Amino acid sequence: MTIEHAADAAPAGERSLAEMLCAARDEYGVEIRLARGGAQAAENYSRRIDRLVMRIYAAASSQAGTPVALLAIGGYGRRHLCLHSDIDLMILFGGPIAAAEERFVKALLHPLWDLGFDVGHQVRQLSELAQAETDNPGFLVAVGDSRFLTGDAGVFERFDTLVHGPESVWRQPTVEALFGLVAERHRHFNATIYQLEPDVKEAPGALRDVAAIRTFVALTQPGTARSVPATS
């Protein structure tokens, strides 16, 4: 058995990864049909996917030779997954990335690909984050919505201080990147065709703007992001 498929070898009495995913999607569908609220259903589904990802991590973790933390970023970080959303991950190593770490990354990602997920993944060494990646606005904004999934809590705490701490050099570049991406999207989706048939996700005032507002509040007023209501 190859290491990338070891995660799906369920112990006796446990569900396979495919069964876990199928059950998560079925439960999401039930919640939507019962009209329990889209935001809550998305959060519940995201938590179920968390458990699946954590299981894959647990099977792969012995491959890494240096401490590693796994983070959810972007929409997955906000727990806004829909049934067929991609999942955005940051694989953050506390030390050098060598052959063992590359094997770990493969062992983590291959089972997700095999399940049909579109995985957006960023691999970083903690020392690389001493400066904000100002040439990568999408990454800056995605990291603004990061949360810890599993792995080395110490690596995550150092990351959190670097990126979200009171003296972080990431905050202002991230705010600027957020404004730039919003303006670019508004220019595109404010065209006449979208006035006739608005895009409920991308258009001005639509779902991406709600997410942008929450991200902005989290960046500029830490601890108050939950005061901005989620959509339902």
Each PLM stretch: what is its role?
Residues 1-232:
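A nucleotide- and high-energy phosphate-metabolite-utilizing enzyme signature
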